[in-house]
């Protein structure tokens, strides 16, 4: 298995992002529906415009099996960069084989090697499998506990 840092201008990386995001959207933990027409192009164009985009793919020698779309931010409390894993998906046909764990471990190693102070992510309350995975790799609820809120615009 190989951790691949996404080059958003590479067509094979773009195709993998869209395939894996569609797989995520189809899942009950996503939207439970396929990607809407025209969204793929907007995703790639939008990511190209984000200077803080940091994406990873997991390559098994034949195909990309997992995706993490991350965004770099800055911790004012630690005066160091951090990154948030915004989307994390292992393709459905590769689940239950340890790819999720080894992929996240490789991402953690990347963060440590590149002097990030931490990695953040959000996880649905009704996704105990993901919660177990994250906890097993030393992720924990924020202390003090925090809410993740959003406002549609």
What are these language model-derived features?
Residues 4-80:
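Acetyl-CoA-dependent GNAT
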Residues 80-92:
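Conserved acetyl-CoA binding element of GNAT-fold acetyltransferases
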Residues 91-93, 97, 125-126:
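Active-site acidic-Proline motif in GNAT/NAT acetyltransferases
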Residues 94, 98-106:
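Conserved acetyl-CoA pyrophosphate-binding loop and the N-cap/start of the following alpha-helix
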Residues 101, 125-144, 151:
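Conserved active-site alpha-helix within GNAT-family acetyltransferase domains
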Residues 104, 111-122:
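Conserved GNAT acetyl-CoA-binding A-motif
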């Amino acid at each position: 298995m190989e951790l691949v840092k996404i080059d958003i201008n590479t067509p094979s990386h773009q195709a993998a992002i869209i395939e894996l995001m569609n797989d995520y959207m189809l899942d009950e933990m996503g939207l439970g529906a396929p990607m809407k027409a025209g969204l793929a192009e907007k995703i790639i164009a939008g990511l190209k415009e984000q200077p803080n985009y940091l994406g990873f793919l997991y390559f098994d020698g034949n195909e990309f099996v997992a995706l993490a779309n991350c965004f770099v931010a800055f911790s004012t409390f630690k005066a160091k960069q951090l990154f948030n894993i915004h989307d994390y998906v292992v393709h459905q046909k590769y689940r239950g084989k340890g790819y999720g764990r080894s992929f996240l471990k490789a991402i953690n190693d990347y963060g440590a090697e590149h002097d990030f102070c931490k990695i953040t992510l959000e996880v649905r309350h009704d996704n105990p499998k993901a919660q177990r995975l994250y906890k097993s790799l030393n992720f924990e609820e924020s202390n003090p506990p925090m809410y993740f809120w959003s406002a549609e615009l």
